[in-house]
């Protein structure tokens, strides 16, 4: 294939209204993989531009122009209405809704591409962990988390803001912690990608969605089902001490499973991008 045939722009659907690492990861990932300018497709332009979806709970927003490469559903009450192509979805619960369109879903790969974060981080300059814990709340939990911070946390707990578009900086902050605590789904996924033990927490008084399907969707890929919810999700009420951090259960996933999932998702994603005439960057050209 000659260079002239390669596409110069890649259209991706993700939210840009509020800065959020999970959403901005779409642009970050695309720029790491292909030699093309990333153009954001918004809800206002989604009906007019052929585009990709990589990461996020926006699969129900897909249409006849969408190539789905990793998104999932936000709520069980929402449906996938249409798509141009579908190759990857976040998990088993999103896969169920594909069966209305596809009799055979055996070709669909499962997994959230956020698990690939580690593949895009410089392996030579990773910080050593200096904090016992890192806490990365969903943006709706930021104020509550700050209310719970005490002097006991000083030099022990690192507060990490998920509302950033600096994915490399976020990863380095996380790598400086021995253990992560997160109410953000992508805080959990990024921790798994980076090999950091992580606890899923919910703050009393806030609930991100009525059914938490996006969490179950992601975890289902690794054999963790929703009936194990109480084992893996910890409710934080009025206090958050260092002793609490130490006793939180972690969502442990076998490192080999994660490594294999990374390879599977990378191979599938790059294969699809090649078919759509994008030039793959040299670092990933062997896939």
From Swiss-Prot:
It holds the Pfam family PS_pyruv_trans. This is Uncharacterized protein L143. It comes from Acanthamoeba polyphaga mimivirus (APMV).
